[in-house]
Amino acid sequence: MVGASGGAAVQRGDVYLVTLHPARGREIRKTRPCVVVSPDELNAALGTYIVAPLTTGSHPYAFRVACRFQGQDGHVVLDQLRTVDRARLAKRLGALSDVTQRKVLTVLQAMFAP
């Protein structure tokens, strides 16, 4: 699938290296892997994406999903969701496993539609 900009379409579950700075206060900062959590229909239409950072230095909290990506254990930090422009997506790194993607969607549903 090809996106509007001519590159590969950004899809839910894809992991990109994303530039998150500037950040304020306790927001996760710097350039780090993030998983796209917005639906494909939104991704194709808007050119902005809802992402959740991945981190290896996290504690297990209710809104963080344990994951393994590129050989490293970590967490999807769903309490730090951000909407970012395509320009912040530096490089596609891969995608989360289907099992982890389902867990992410389950936690998001619990967060927003309890």
Range-by-range predicted roles:
Residues M1-P114:
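Conserved functional hotspots at enzyme active or ligand-binding sites that engage polyanionic ligands
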